[in-house]
């Protein structure tokens, strides 16, 4: 017998930065940047977070700056 697929509408991800009207992504705002980093310390992709391409580029730059300044770890401490 063939298995049936369960359908269902997936909820569209919302760009957190655009929804909260954040104009400038500051590298010193580690609380915001932590939302977009995995527990292993990797930057989460757009398909997971739902950010737009423009905001994802800004996020990546801010996270890399924060890492260089020592505000965020490069890898997690397990």
Curated annotation (Swiss-Prot):
InterPro entries: Ribosomal_bS18, Ribosomal_bS18_CS, Ribosomal_bS18_sf
Entry's Gene Ontology molecular function annotations: small ribosomal subunit rRNA binding; structural constituent of ribosome
GO cellular component annotations of the record: cytosolic small ribosomal subunit
Membrane-traversing stretches: none
Family matches, as Pfam families: Ribosomal_S18
Gene3D superfamilies assigned to the protein according to its UniProt record, in alphabetical order: Ribosomal protein S18
Regions annotated as coiled coil: none
Example of a GO biological process term: translation
Family: Belongs to the bacterial ribosomal protein bS18 family.
Function: Binds as a heterodimer with protein bS6 to the central domain of the 16S rRNA, where it helps stabilize the platform of the 30S subunit.
The protein's assembly and partners: Part of the 30S ribosomal subunit. Forms a tight heterodimer with protein bS6.
Alphabetical list of HAMAP family matching this protein: Ribosomal_bS18 (MF_00270)
Protein name: Small ribosomal subunit protein bS18
